[in-house]
C-alpha cells in the first residue's frame, strides 16, 4: 500500500517538475524520491522485472524518480579518500567491513557504484562503473573497465567481461533498459545498447555490438531477430552482403550453447571466494 502511495506521489511530482523553484515542493518531493532511491539501493524494487510470462515490464515511474533525484539534489564533495563532485554519491561510502562480508560483495579499488544501483550477494566488482538504477544480481562478475549503464538489468551468475559497455537509458524516458538475463557471458569489448534483451544462458563472443536495429541472424535457420538474443545462443560478429557489393555489420548466432561452450566460460569459484 505504501509503495502505491509513493508511486502516485512520484507521478504527481513528475507532472509538476517545472515548479521546482518552489522550495516547499522541492522539500516534499525529496522525501518521496529518497524513499525510492533507498528501495532501489536495497534491491526491494527495480526498474525492470520479469513476469511469469517471460516478458519484462519497465516501471517508468521509478526511472522518473531517478531523474527527479538529479533535479532535487545539489552537487557536493564526495570524499572517500579520493574526492569527487557530483549529485549522486558513492553507494559504498558509508559501508563498513562487516556489511561487505555479510553481503559477500567484493569491490576492487577503482570500481565506482552510484547510489541507487543494487548489487546482489557474491558479486565481484573489478575496476568498473555501475550507474544509477542499475541492478546487478547475485553471483555476477563485472570485469575491468566495464560500464553498466543507468537502469540496466544484469541477471544472476553472469560474467560481464573486460571493457564491455551495457547501455543506459534515462533519456528518452520511455525507452526500455538493456536486460542481460541469468547465466549469460558477455565477451570482452562487446556493446549491448538501446534496450536489447539478451536471453538466459546466451554467450556473446569478443567484440559483439548489438543495438535495437542490429540484425541478429541465426546461421542455421536464416531467421533474423531484432532487439533480442534468443536463449542459449552463441553469438559472434559477422557481416551480411548489402547493395553495391558493400557488406554491413550483423551479429550471427552460430550455435546453441553446448558443453564445450560451457567449459570455456564456466565460473571460476576461486575468484568468487
From Swiss-Prot:
Signal peptide: none annotated. It comes from the Bacteria. Its main location: cytoplasm. It catalyses: (S)-2,3,4,5-tetrahydrodipicolinate + succinyl-CoA + H2O = (S)-2-succinylamino-6-oxoheptanedioate + CoA. SUPFAM superfamilies: Trimeric LpxA-like enzymes. Its EC number is 2.3.1.117. Belongs to the transferase hexapeptide repeat family. This is 2,3,4,5-tetrahydropyridine-2,6-dicarboxylate N-succinyltransferase. It comes from Wolbachia pipientis wMel.
Amino acid at each position: 500500500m505504501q509503495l502505491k502511495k509513493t508511486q502516485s506521489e512520484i507521478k504527481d511530482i513528475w507532472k509538476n517538475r517545472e515548479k521546482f523553484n518552489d522550495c516547499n515542493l522541492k522539500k516534499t518531493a525529496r522525501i518521496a524520491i529518497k524513499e525510492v532511491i533507498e528501495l532501489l539501493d536495497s534491491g526491494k524494487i527495480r526498474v525492470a522485472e520479469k513476469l511469469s510470462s517471460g516478458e519484462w515490464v519497465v516501471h517508468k515511474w521509478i526511472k522518473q524518480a531517478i531523474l527527479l533525484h538529479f533535479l532535487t539534489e545539489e552537487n557536493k564533495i564526495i570524499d572517500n579518500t579520493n574526492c569527487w563532485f557530483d549529485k549522486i554519491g558513492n553507494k559504498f561510502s558509508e559501508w563498513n567491513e562487516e556489511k561487505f562480508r555479510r553481503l559477500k560483495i567484493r569491490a576492487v579499488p577503482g570500481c565506482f557504484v552510484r547510489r541507487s544501483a543494487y548489487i546482489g550477494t557474491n558479486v565481484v566488482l573489478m575496476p568498473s562503473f555501475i550507474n544509477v538504477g542499475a541492478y546487478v544480481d547475485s553471483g555476477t562478475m563485472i570485469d575491468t573497465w566495464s560500464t553498466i549503464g543507468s537502469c540496466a538489468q544484469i541477471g544472476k551468475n553472469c560474467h560481464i567481461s573486460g571493457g564491455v559497455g551495457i547501455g543506459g537509458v534515462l533519456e528518452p524516458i520511455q525507452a526500455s533498459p538493456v536486460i542481460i538475463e541469468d547465466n549469460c557471458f558477455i565477451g570482452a569489448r562487446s556493446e549491448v545498447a538501446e534496450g536489447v534483451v539478451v536471453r538466459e544462458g546466451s554467450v556473446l563472443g569478443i567484440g559483439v555490438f548489438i543495438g535495437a536495429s542490429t540484425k541478429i541472424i541465426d546461421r542455421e535457420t536464416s531467421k533474423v531477430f531484432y532487439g533480442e538474443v534468443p536463449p542459449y545462443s552463441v553469438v559472434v560478429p559477422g557481416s551480411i552482403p548489402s547493395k553495391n557489393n558493400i557488406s554491413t555489420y550483423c551479429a550471427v548466432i552460430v550455435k546453441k550453447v553446448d558443453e564445450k561452450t560451457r567449459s570455456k566460460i564456466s565460473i571460476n569459484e576461486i575468484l568468487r571466494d
